[in-house]
C-alpha cells in the first residue's frame, strides 16, 4: 500500500533506475491562525496568517521524456482539461522560462481533498516546479521559481520556498518562523466552500488589530473566517463541534477542513479512531520544513556522495 505520510517513505525514495519515475511529495498545509485586518480600496483584504506544512499529502511520480518535450499528465481529472491543470501549467511555464527541450511523464497520486483549504492544488503546482527544475537541471533560483508560482496562485510561493511562514498584507510580506510542530487530526466535511461568499459576507470581521508575530505566537490561535463559515455550512459546524470535544480546534483558511491539535501522536490517533464515518480525515504532524525540500536535500547529498566516492581499481 502506498504511503501518503512522507516521513515513512522518503528514506527509500532517493534512487532512480533508468527511466523509472521519482516520487516527489506534495504536502498539505494548515493556516494555524488567520486574522483579517482590513479591506483595501481594490477589494483585497489585509491578512495576518501562519502557514505550516504537514507530513501528509499527495505524491507526484515524475520521469523525464527525452524523446520529445511533451508533458503527459495522468490520471485525467473529471471536468478539468489537462491544459488547465495547475501541474501541467507549472511544467509548461518552467519549460518556456528555462528553454527546456525535454518533456515529462507526471502521475498524480491524489489523496488530499479538493476544496479543503489544505493547499492541494497549490502544493501540486509547486512540487511540479521544484522537482522539474531539479530533474531537467533548469537551474532556476528558488526566487525565480516562486515568481513563476505566483502566476499560478497566491499560495504557490509558500510551497515553493518550503518553510513555515507568517504572511501579512495581501500575502506578499513573508517572515519565516518555527511554530511548535504539533500533531493534528484533520477532518474534511462534505461541504464545498465558496471563498467569495465568505469574504463578501457583511458579518465577516475586517478590523482585527495587527499584532507582532511574537505576540501572535504567544496567544491562542484563532481564525476570523470561522464563525461566518459555520453559519453558511452546517457540516463544517458539525465537524468542528465534534473535534472541540477533545482538543482546541479551528478552521484552516476558509475551509472546509477543520483541525484539532495535540502534543503527542498517540493522543491524536486515539481521537481519530473515534471519527464519525461521515468525515474524511487523517492524522499528521506539523512540519516547519516542507517534505519536498527535505527530499531534495537528501537527493543532493546522495548525488554528491556518489560523485566523491573513490574509484575502485
From Swiss-Prot:
Any one GO MF annotation of this record: 4-(cytidine 5'-diphospho)-2-C-methyl-D-erythritol kinase activity
GO BP term, example: terpenoid biosynthetic process
Gene3D superfamilies in UniProt: 3.30.230.10, GHMP kinase, C-terminal domain
Entry keywords, A to Z: ATP-binding, Isoprene biosynthesis, Kinase, Nucleotide-binding, Transferase
Pathway membership, UniProt: Isoprenoid biosynthesis; isopentenyl diphosphate biosynthesis via DXP pathway; isopentenyl diphosphate from 1-deoxy-D-xylulose 5-phosphate: step 3/6
Keyword Transmembrane: no
UniProt KW Glycoprotein keyword: no
Function description: Catalyzes the phosphorylation of the position 2 hydroxy group of 4-diphosphocytidyl-2C-methyl-D-erythritol.
Name assigned to this protein: 4-diphosphocytidyl-2-C-methyl-D-erythritol kinase
Source organism of this protein record: Haemophilus influenzae (strain 86-028NP)
Name of the coding gene: ispE
Amino acid at each position: 500500500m502506498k504511503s501518503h505520510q512522507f516521513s515513512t517513505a522518503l528514506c527509500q525514495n532517493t534512487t532512480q533506475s533508468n527511466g523509472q519515475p521519482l516520487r516527489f511529495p506534495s504536502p498539505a498545509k494548515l493556516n494555524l491562525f488567520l486574522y483579517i485586518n482590513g479591506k483595501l480600496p481594490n477589494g483585497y483584504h489585509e491578512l495576518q496568517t501562519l502557514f505550516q506544512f504537514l507530513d501528509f499529502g499527495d505524491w507526484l511520480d515524475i520521469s523525464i521524456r527525452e524523446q520529445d518535450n511533451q508533458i503527459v499528465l495522468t490520471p485525467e481529472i473529471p471536468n478539468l482539461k489537462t491544459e488547465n491543470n495547475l501541474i501541467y501549467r507549472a511544467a509548461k511555464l518552467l519549460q518556456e522560462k528555462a528553454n527546456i527541450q525535454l518533456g515529462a511523464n507526471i502521475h498524480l497520486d491524489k489523496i488530499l481533498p479538493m476544496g479543503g483549504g489544505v493547499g492541494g492544488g497549490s502544493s501540486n503546482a509547486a512540487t511540479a516546479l521544484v522537482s522539474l527544475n531539479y530533474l531537467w537541471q533548469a537551474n532556476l533560483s528558488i526566487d525565480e521559481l516562486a515568481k513563476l508560482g505566483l502566476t499560478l496562485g497566491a499560495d504557490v510561493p509558500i510551497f515553493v520556498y518550503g518553510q513555515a511562514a507568517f504572511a501579512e498584507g495581501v500575502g506578499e510580506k513573508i517572515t519565516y518562523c518555527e511554530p511548535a510542530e504539533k500533531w493534528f487530526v484533520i477532518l474534511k466535511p462534505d461541504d464545498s466552500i465558496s471563498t467569495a461568499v465568505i469574504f463578501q459576507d457583511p458579518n465577516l470581521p475586517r478590523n482585527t488589530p495587527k499584532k507582532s508575530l511574537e505576540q501572535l505566537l504567544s496567544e491562542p490561535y484563532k481564525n476570523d473566517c470561522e464563525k461566518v463559515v459555520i453559519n453558511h455550512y452546517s457540516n463544517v459546524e458539525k465537524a468542528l463541534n465534534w473535534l472541540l470535544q477533545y482538543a482546541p480546534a479551528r478552521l484552516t483558511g476558509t475551509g472546509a477542513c477543520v483541525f484539532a491539535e495535540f502534543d503527542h501522536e498517540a493522543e491524536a490517533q486515539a481521537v481519530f479512531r473515534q471519527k464519525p464515518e461521515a468525515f474524511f480525515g487523517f492524522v499528521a504532524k506539523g512540519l516547519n520544513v516542507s517534505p519536498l525540500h527535505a527530499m531534495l536535500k537528501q537527493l543532493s547529498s546522495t548525488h554528491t556522495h556518489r560523485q566523491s566516492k573513490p574509484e575502485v581499481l
